Amino acid sequence: MEKLRIVGGNKLSGTISCSGAKNAALPMLAATILTDEQITFKNLPYLQDITTMFEILGSMGAEITLNECMDFIISTSKIHDFEARYELVKTMRASILVLGSLVARHGFAKIALPGGCAIGTRPVDFHLDALTKLGAKIELKNGYIEATAKKLIGCDINFPGVSVTGTENIMMAAVLAKGQTILRNVAKEPEVEDLANFLNSMGAKINGAGSDEIIIDGVNNLNGTKFSIPADRIEAGTYLVAAAITGGNVTLSNVQAPRMNNILDKLKLSGASINIGKDNIQLSMNKGSILPVDISTAPFPGFPTDMQAQFTVLNALSKGSSVVTENVFENRFMHVQELNRMGCDITVKGSNAFVKGVGSLNGAPVMATDLRASASLILAGLCANGETIVDRIYHIDRGYERIEEKLSYLGADITRLPN
């Protein structure tokens, strides 16, 4: 199992480009099932989760090629197998995103109940209940979801709770449904807007993405398109925190700052100096001058749960005390035990982590438990005294493209160790 070796103490400086957003790309890849025509993707990140989705589509009969411009071209016109098998689905919860597309276009889907990060319960009930309202028949058999429908029929759906993948799955199902579908209490994440823009570029009729209500007028078919994956706001936020905690000066290019206001506002409160350009963000911070900032996660436009672990590290290095509250997922403080092994002073009580700033950390062997926990351990290693070895880094490869290369380019002493 590969590991990352980090020797802390180096200030990060320089400019790097942000990769395409995994959380935007995955539903778009699932949506390629909705058309017979070719889809071309630019700026698709090279990540394990993307590879897993490729494997799922490929196992169904999709054709995936790479052109001379490094764009991915996908054709699902020859799909003949409508099953997403457990051996592929078990590593990634987003695998369920193929459910809506398969039922909408082919009338049948057999999807293994999903796996992914072990950060709490993320039920698929919202997906299944909404598909049932659209006219699908749902059965759970031997760990698989089986969905059938002759033709989905538009209707009003009020989600009982906010679900990003639930919103995306039903959007994809509804674009080919007969009549109008109105989705209420939907997720407002930028990636939901990205999916709507992508589907509309294929000929869908979707309005309201980014608000509490999405209106979808079904169409008979969708066409091919060319689409560039927007920048990953969570990757960008992670590198900005890395710059802040090392007392660095880093510029990120290919980034959309308006999507990151909730992150940037907290970084400013922590003492960072931030300059925003048309498609870039520059952050500088004096080492040792971090101010504590309370964090409370919430669905967009609130503070993203996917940045909670990174800001826990920032607060651990601050001058003062703070409270980090996790409102989105339970059991998402598994990184705390490992951070405390490096010298952090963090106490978890229920959904709150009480963080006392310690000023400095010490390198140690640590083990990643999920994607964002992996990122927090790497961040801690960047500013710790001595050597940190991060084990089980397959988690980080699910969501960060070439993280050791990008950090090395900025001046970090970080090396990937082979098995």
Predicted feature descriptions by range:
Residues 1-419:
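Short, structured segments at the rim of ligand-binding sites
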